[in-house]
């Protein structure tokens, strides 16, 4: 009996120590009294000692913010926000509370781009049952001053919605408590955006019990509201930047005549496209955006344009442009939004406006290396708003410029922008795509505008200022200086930041042309490491499986007016690739239909000035040296496929453009090959490399007396090499942009997979269901009689996710994985399968993981990545090609379940004492 008493005492003492070691609160046992006595003090509820809230970590008479119905005949319900638990800001903190600073996590001040967390603590205890299950809770709320002056100052991290037109910031989230016996902490987090300095943010929060065990109890109105939470004050310092991007609307330049139909045909002046972007960045000596914010009113800035000329003849000195003498001043032809509207209207004080041009058409006006200028207002509250926010600001506002001030070496335009709208999202991608980044995480763009700059081009061959006909380059320096901004009270705040760029008029052939090559699958999939933004770039690691066809992509990039046209030769190794008659004739049609760029920026297709020919190599030499360096004269050319085949296998196609063309890209996308070689690696059965290449001859003058060969002096070092097992040992050199050859590797098989989860956002109390769909591609002509290929499927689950033993299925069978623990806290789950004659397909993997809140990274909402890697002897590509991944988001919910444990111990004194202990923030 004494022994049993000692055991009970030790057990109870251990439980007390455990409770004392937790970090915020927990409810012990059931509420003794469901009728809480309370009194009011300044509209804030003060709960008396008999309230169960005392058992949740509050001292007697501590002020809490709560009102509403706290229970029913079915259950007792407590929810509160303890003021001292509210955390306004995150580490590290500053030494002062000046604009942009915050010295403490509980001083009522929060920096911009920081967070405020309101721990909403909930306890539910049954009255008539030992336990209740599946208690559905709904938490909603709004944020006072969440939107002011066309700006979203803050938003809710989970379930948030911002209505700019109505000026309302709100949130709506649901959570299901699996069973009573757990106390709950739900963090309601406000994410401060680029708020105005000194704004007071005040959330109003409501929590309601929706249903219990599937039964709707909304009519009982069991809810708590929090409408007297003390506001926090935002702290922000303006840090606006400007950025100039060239090549607006796919143009580096176009002839002025493309925009002014009244210009003389002899006018050879140019128009360059540029964009100006206003954004904010992190304050000096900080590595994130905390404390930085946007200006409140009009931004005043100005342009300074200048220019200089450098000559290829080094005996001629660099010339600075003189706009008061022999050089015509640079002008702003027009400016406007970056959008899909092709018809552009001249703006006041621009050259187009002064000339009385009514309108003009802009080709691809949405294409730019910055964000779009606005989201259509009818899409602001659309369910698919993410389609627009990824590459667009909300509203760039109104831009105005002055008339130009022309000086000797400088042209100045004063400008301003106002009435911009700042939402809760900021663009990351280019205006014309959703997969090419334009901004880093610390760059928040809010206004973009396109400018067309008119340059006189007076230093062209035999131009007004180049009668000596010497090759040269003209550099136009464009500088944008932010002078000041106006705050919300109309005060003008002086500012000084600048950005610049240089645009070039090339009056020399060298550097004006480049060639690109790449392999693709017949259906258009890029082979090799994807090159974001421009896929027709050599990678060196392109591969395909035995027997799979490929196609060749080749580009000639043009940055100059070319009066005599060009000859482009697309060539390949005939030991590795075969061009069928159907493919050859298709390629000719494709080349002619894609055409070339006119002086006005339009595409000329199906012209009688463009011819296609089929080439037979003069020498039977498929060496690396021969293919990379063969020129037009190294082939015999024929007008038809059938005629050429009489003399051998076709080894090249010639694209002969006998017409003037301008800036743009001459594209080839239609040369389809049968892959002849079956040998693994990059060398075929005859010992020559699997390569394609492109050569080009440029004719600067219409008489074609002068020929310039693109990349004529290029050094070709090596093609990509593989060992006998198909493992890459050396990457081709040169490689990447402006390289006119590409290597293809051959593999015996190709594996791939897709990782999916049952949701994308989870609470920390949830389980994550993971599915991995594994695929294998084998050669179509393969003899499967002796197929015996072992495949490893390795799923990498990060620290914070624990595999639930017994849940794993491979196909329809429960098969437990091999588990390897990693030093970084992650785990690898490994399955194996063997491909055979009767088993040529990999199966799906399905399993569950339990979220381990203790091991999650810091923060109320965190992201994790699940990866799957396939390994085999037949697919020896780099691991990145055999890896797939899935990202999930986890919202932390604090929870500890002690009531049930204490109840089983039947230690009544512990229950009556209603011990208060801290909750672990999970």
Curated annotation (Swiss-Prot):
Keywords: Membrane, Plasmid, Transmembrane, Transmembrane helix. GO terms for cellular component: membrane. Its main location: membrane. It is found in: Membrane. The chain crosses the membrane at residues 9-31. It is a single-pass membrane protein. This is Uncharacterized protein pXO2-29/pXO2-30/BXB0028/GBAA_pXO2_0028.
